[in-house]
Amino acid sequence: MAKFDLTAKNCQYLDRHLTFPLLEFLLQKDIYDQTSLLKFILQTVSKTNMVDYTMDIRERLNMGDELPEELSKRRANVLVKLKELQTEVAPLMKCMEELKNPDSMKDSKSIVHALQQEFDFKHDIIKSAQKLAKYLYECGNYRDSISYLYICLLVMEPADKNYLTVLWGKLAAEILVLNWPTALEDLTRLRDFIDNHNFSPIEVLQQRTWLIHWSVLVFFNHAKGRDLIIEMFLYKPLYLNAIQTMCPHILRYLATAVIINRGRRNALKDLIKIIQQESYTYRDPITEFLEHLYVNFDFEGARMKLHECQTVIVNDFFIIGCLQEFIENARLMIFETFCRIHQCITIGMLADKLNMEPDEAECWIVNLIRNARLDAKIDSKLGHVVMGTQPLSPYQQLVEKIDSLSVRSEALTVLVERKQKAKTQESGEGNWKYY
């Protein structure tokens, strides 16, 4: 399924360290030639100080398990440089340890003032701390890097030219150690900085595009992420504009979030509108599934796309963890839409629409009824599912009636248009024969 693989597109907007998990994931999928992929990883890792990882890739490429002289010298140089930077930064670490309650101080100026008053603090040492954090990060020592980046953010002013770089570094490191609560805090902090800083239009568009890609990693691993990704990507115009302008492929992840989030079904109409607008620049089985189901009311097309969606998700690093939820919710969406048009359905017909065996479909409906997520009865003798009606207020009845009529009208309109189009094509073919 290389056709729908987004790894190359996504990696353009990720720090090279963030690409390593994606590339290792691809190695397990046999989508691309293993040797070519390993060579690309080796080329990428050679730009870091991760000597051990470099050796691991060399071994997998059968390049020998002995440490080449070049790498041996590089490792020695890395250790020397690391020791130098740690010595330079040691006074700052000691000061921060002895400083009482730095977190409770209002801003960086207060902390720096306290450090200058009590410890004869020199501002240049912050640059050394930033260099050390970056060096540790390049060595793959992300946890220690976070400690220094945290201190840098405590003592640096937002106006500092390196402040934005430190924010990005902190977010990357938190993602790489899988610390999702703090990563979300850093993501919010970085987004606020980008939105309120005086960037040029091109710069701010680039920053938002990078942030969108990094945030996908956070949102699909955080408990609140499924709501937050919808709020940020669909309902923040500046970020929606960035997606439409720079990276419409991100609609895959927005669509996935809406599908697996039952509490956000109200976002479907807005999402589908965007998917239709961008269909000329990007489409995949996930976006097409929604189009088939909610625009064309093509249940057969939706069923076929759902099958393709499973293959896409299995091969996508960002959303593979959502596979079962996606299938369950997509089936439920097909079922709900189908039931709004038909009140009585045969289990066989339903099984066909849901890509299930009849027994499996019946069991699935029984579980829905048992869990109070569906008001329906099963007539096992006739093999029918009869939709129930719950008592509603007059207002709710009116809304439901209008909604149901709207869905049926749209479905009929699409059906009539489809038949008319078929007749026109047949007519055109007939006329052509006379020439």
From Swiss-Prot:
Assembly, per entry: Component of the eukaryotic translation initiation factor 3 (eIF-3) complex.
CDD domains: eIF3E
Organism: Aedes aegypti
Function noted in UniProt: Component of the eukaryotic translation initiation factor 3 (eIF-3) complex, which is involved in protein synthesis of a specialized repertoire of mRNAs and, together with other initiation factors, stimulates binding of mRNA and methionyl-tRNAi to the 40S ribosome. The eIF-3 complex specifically targets and initiates translation of a subset of mRNAs involved in cell proliferation.
Domain of life: Eukaryota
Listed GO CC annotations: eukaryotic 43S preinitiation complex; eukaryotic 48S preinitiation complex; eukaryotic translation initiation factor 3 complex, eIF3e
UniProt xrefs under SMART domains: eIF3_N, PINT
Cross-referenced InterPro entries: eIF3e, eIF3e_N, PCI_dom, WH_DNA-bd_sf
Entry protein name: Eukaryotic translation initiation factor 3 subunit E
Entry's localization field: Cytoplasm
GO molecular function: translation initiation factor activity
Keyword Protein biosynthesis: yes
Keyword list, A-Z: Cytoplasm, Initiation factor, Protein biosynthesis
Domain PCI: 219-392
One Gene Ontology term from the biological process aspect of the record: formation of cytoplasmic translation initiation complex
Sequence similarity: Belongs to the eIF-3 subunit E family.
